[in-house]
Swiss-Prot record:
Tree of life domain: Eukaryota
Pfam families for the chain: Abhydrolase_6
Known role: Demethylates proteins that have been reversibly carboxymethylated. Demethylates PPP2CB (in vitro) and PPP2CA. Binding to PPP2CA displaces the manganese ion and inactivates the enzyme.
Phosphoprotein listed as a keyword: yes
Similarity comment: family membership: Belongs to the AB hydrolase superfamily.
Protein's UniProt name: Protein phosphatase methylesterase 1
Catalytic center residues: S156, D181, H349
Gene3D superfamilies: alpha/beta hydrolase
Residue spans of biased composition, Basic and acidic residues class: 268-280
InterPro entries in the cross-refs: AB_hydrolase_1 (IPR000073), AB_hydrolase_fold (IPR029058), Epox_hydrolase-like (IPR000639), PPase_methylesterase_euk (IPR016812)
Gene from which the chain derives: PPME1
Coiled-coil ranges (or none): none
Catalytic activity: [phosphatase 2A protein]-C-terminal L-leucine methyl ester + H2O = [phosphatase 2A protein]-C-terminal L-leucine + methanol + H(+)
Length: 380
């Protein structure tokens, strides 16, 4: 059992404090982490997985936007990686190390607008059209009129944006397309329960370690190694009131105080600031993006996606966590041989984080089969 597989198994443990000497409650020497040791939830820097980082400036009618990219590799095709909603380019960190060791390629992992360290003027416009244009603009800003061969790989929302980018011909040198665990039918069905899922998440975290621990124990990311680098891109330090409940109680207190004595506003404001500071001190981290507020764009990401994917006239790969995720259009397309499909069981939705080696093998095999890239170290 590899270290990654151990992490995946550990990630499925029920939510409870880690036990010294076992890394959890599973029996067997193989699962042990050494006497007296606890699982390490400390964050890991991006530089352990990527070679460099760049902020790419994109000019448009209203000014400049800055997109964060993480890069590795110097030869071969560019794999342009697009993360899922709420995640960041750092979700591709462990996959990047795995794919770079298998084939000659270059990695460009992009923080989409509203996510990670990307800074745009209108971060709330997360329409498929806008984000697809962003991808094309970043490629143009990085490579000019002669971009290298590029394969788009996207997970969930990022997979949908990859398809919209490809179908709109926004990347002229596109040679391949890969979607990871995103299917129109399944995605559309899931939208109804998405708000409930988001409401069930913690609003704030006491520390980065606390956020990483939650992501693994909740099953959002089943691979501890990936969670330690990925969650840094999902949360940020709070700037104002960190808890909606805290905000509500503070506002109600202000209203009551003003009704009783309008002249007491100075003391109320002082108390409000003190309450804010206490909240920030106790739970200084929150989500970088409020996904619940992006609901109006969800339908546009996924509706018609299957036919858009099938109509792209380039080699295509679909990686799924379960075969039950296929919808009717993709089932027919798969039977007709219009794309290559691989199911990676025992994964959660974040397939490329839960099983980065297996995803890297699938992508590397796809690249070699189509003669897009050369193998490294005897990989076949």
């Amino acid at each position: 059992m590899s270290a990654l597989e151990k992490s995946m198994h550990l990630g499925r443990l029920p939510s409870r404090p880690p036990l010294p000497g076992s890394g959890g409650s599973q029996s067997g020497a193989k699962m042990r982490m050494g006497p007296g040791r606890k699982r390490d939830f400390s964050p890991v820097p991006w530089s352990q997985y990527f070679e460099s980082m760049e902020d790419v400036e994109v000019e448009n009618e209203t000014g400049k936007d800055t997109f964060r990219v993480y890069k590795s590799g110097s030869e071969g095709p560019v794999l342009l990686l697009l993360h899922g909603g709420g995640h960041s380019a750092l979700s591709w960190a462990v996959f990047t190390a795995a794919i770079i060791s298998r084939v000659q390629c270059r990695i460009v992992a992009l923080d989409l607008r509203g996510h990670g360290e990307t800074k745009v003027r209108n971060s709330e416009d997360l329409s498929a059209e806008t984000m697809a244009k962003d991808v094309g603009n970043v490629v143009e800003a990085m490579y000019g009129d002669l971009p290298p061969p590029i394969m788009l790989i996207g997970h969930s929302m990022g997979g949908a944006i990859a398809v919209h980018t490809a179908s709109s011909n926004l990347v002229p040198s596109l040679l391949g397309l890969c979607m990871i665990d995103v299917v129109e039918g399944t995605a559309m069905d899931a939208l109804n329960s998405m708000q409930n899922f988001l409401r069930g998440r913690p609003k704030t975290f006491k520390s980065l370690e606390n956020a990483i621990e939650w992501s693994v124990k909740s099953g959002q990311i089943r691979n501890l190694e990936s969670a330690r680098v990925s969650m840094v891109g999902q949360v940020k330090q709070c700037e104002g009131i960190t808890s909606p409940e805290g905000s509500k109680s503070i506002v109600e207190g202000i209203i009551e105080e003003e009704e009783e004595d309008e002249e007491g506003s100075e003391s109320v404001n002082k108390r409000k600031k003190e309450d804010d500071m206490e909240t920030k001190k106790d739970h200084p981290y929150t989500w970088r993006i409020e996904l619940a507020k992006t609901e109006k764009y969800w339908d546009g990401w996924f509706r018609g996606l299957s036919n858009l994917f099938l109509s792209c006239p380039i080699p295509k790969l679909l990686l799924l966590a379960g075969v039950d995720r296929l919808d009717k259009d993709l089932t027919i397309g798969q039977m007709q041989g219009k794309f290559q499909m691989q199911v990676l069981p025992q994964c959660g939705h974040a397939v490329h984080e839960d099983a980065p080696d297996k995803v890297a093998e699938a992508v590397a095999t796809f690249l070699i089969r189509h003669r897009f890239a050369e193998p490294i170290g005897g990989f076949q």
